[in-house]
Structures are given as C-alpha cells and as structure tokens.
C-alpha cells in the first residue's frame, strides 16, 4: 500500500528490507543523521504475540546538532523527535517512508519552523539519494 499523504516522504526500493536497510542507513549518514533507535516490528510481533508478519522496521534518525537547536527553541518539540524512518517490505520491495519534519514539528511554533524546514531539506536529500540509487521508484 503506497502512502499518498503530502506530509509523507516515500520511495520504494526494489530490494528486500534486509538489503535496503544498509542503503537507507548510508543515505542518512551522508546527511549527518545517526540512527539512535530501532524497532523491529516483525521480531516484536513474533516474540510478544506469536504473529508472523512481513519485515517492518522503524529507524529513529537524528541529526544531533539540529535536534539540539529544535529543543533549545521549544523543549516540547522533543515529543516529535527523532525522525522515524519506516522500512516496510511489500511484494519483495521495500517502501521507505518518513513524516515530513515540517508536519511533525509545525505545531511547536514559529521558532521551530525554520529548523523544521532545514531538517526537511536534509531528509528530502536522503530520499532523493535513495531515488537516484535505484532504477525504478514509486
């Protein structure tokens, strides 16, 4: 299922999640994002619920300098950090998606808006890099 919300950045990589994840991590690192959290939903659902599900991970990506500026501008904005990058395997490909930082941080006031725009520009470059790395995208 492809996401169509204007508040979501998305790209489909023609790779299984296990192969797409290092590509995504590399693209994030190139834009100064580190992965500070990781949730493997497939593993958690299997362990906790006995449910088999397709591969699905969320990577919590953070640019520490930018995050520090956001929190300094409005401490409550930490509620929207880090940027969650979702990797979801569908039909042998991996959908990579993220909520636009301007959408996630927009409710925290005008002092955060320019920082959200900077974060979004950086994250958009990550997704552009991922699109450039493949021959087909969605």
Ranges and model annotations:
Residues 1-31, 128, 132, 136:
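Terminal, regulation- and interaction-focused segments at domain boundaries
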Residues 84-109:
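Beta-strand/loop substructures that line and gate deep hydrophobic ligand-binding cavities in soluble
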Residues 5-7, 55, 81, 92:
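A generic structural signal for well-ordered coil/turn residues at beta-strand boundaries
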Residues 79-92, 130-136:
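Short secondary-structure transition/capping segments
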Residues 34-86:
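Compact, glycine-rich, soluble single-domain proteins
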């Amino acid at each position: 299922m492809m996401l169509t919300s204007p508040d979501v950045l998305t790209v489909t990589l023609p790779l299984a999640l296990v192969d797409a994840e290092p590509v995504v991590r590399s693209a994030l690192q190139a834009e100064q994002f580190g992965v500070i959290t990781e949730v493997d939903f497939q593993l958690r659902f299997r362990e906790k619920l006995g449910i088999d599900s397709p591969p699905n991970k969320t990577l919590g990506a953070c640019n520490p300098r930018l995050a520090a500026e956001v929190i300094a501008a409005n401490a409550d904005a930490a509620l929207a950090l880090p940027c969650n990058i979702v990797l979801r395997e569908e039909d042998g490909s991996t959908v990579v998606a993220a909520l636009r930082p301007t959408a996630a941080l927009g409710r925290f006031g005008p002092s955060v808006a320019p920082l959200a725009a900077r974060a979004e520009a950086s994250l958009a470059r990550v997704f552009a890099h991922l699109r450039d790395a493949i021959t087909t995208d969605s």
